[in-house]
């Protein structure tokens, strides 16, 4: 498409939250490239290691997380993204739980983005593969983290009290 991506004024930091390594590349690669070209510092937050991905039985499954992480870091470098964070949840198991929300809030408070991109938390029956349960969980956990948790200094007080991470409004 030749559509131009408009970067909102004042955006200098963006956070992209997805379920799996490679979700950024399939879902938001062009947007990430436009952000980086506009001078925005982009951070990736990947909820799982993608350990259940692929259909190759010849690879030792215990090696998959390291492979998927390395692939994502290499792909990020192509865009000019150097900050890639992995939450380490098991592929196929994320829920929009308080643990996942807290971990996303932590990253948001560390990065302090003005823009957050994530996957849709809604099921799309017309495009079922886009409605992977992990994608929906990452999207819902991110939405809950965005409001109200990240801006509420009393949400996940351990982040403030133990890690010095103050509330942040995206």
Map each language-model feature to its residues.
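Metal-dependent de-N-acetylase/amidase catalytic core
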Residues: 1-17, 95-170
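Active-site rim/loop-helix segments in enzyme catalytic domains that contact anionic ligands
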Residues: 1-112
């Amino acid at each position: 498409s030749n559509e131009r991506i408009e970067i909102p004024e004042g955006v200098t930091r963006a956070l992209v939250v997805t379920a799996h390594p490679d979700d950024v590349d399939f879902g938001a690669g062009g947007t990430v490239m436009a952000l980086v070209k506009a001078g925005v510092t982009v951070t990736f937050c990947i909820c799982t290691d993608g350990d259940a991905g692929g259909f190759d039985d010849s690879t030792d499954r215990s090696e998959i997380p390291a492979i998927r992480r390395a692939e994502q870091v290499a792909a990020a470098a192509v865009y000019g993204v150097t900050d890639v964070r992995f939450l380490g949840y098991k592929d196929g198991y994320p829920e929009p739980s308080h643990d996942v929300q807290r971990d996303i809030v932590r990253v948001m408070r560390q990065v302090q983005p003005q823009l957050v991109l994530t996957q849709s938390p809604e099921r799309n029956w017309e495009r079922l593969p886009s409605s992977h349960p992990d994608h929906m969980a990452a999207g819902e956990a991110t939405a809950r983290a965005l409001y109200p948790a990240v801006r509420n200094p009393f949400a996940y007080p351990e982040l403030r009290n133990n890690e010095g991470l103050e509330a942040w409004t995206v």
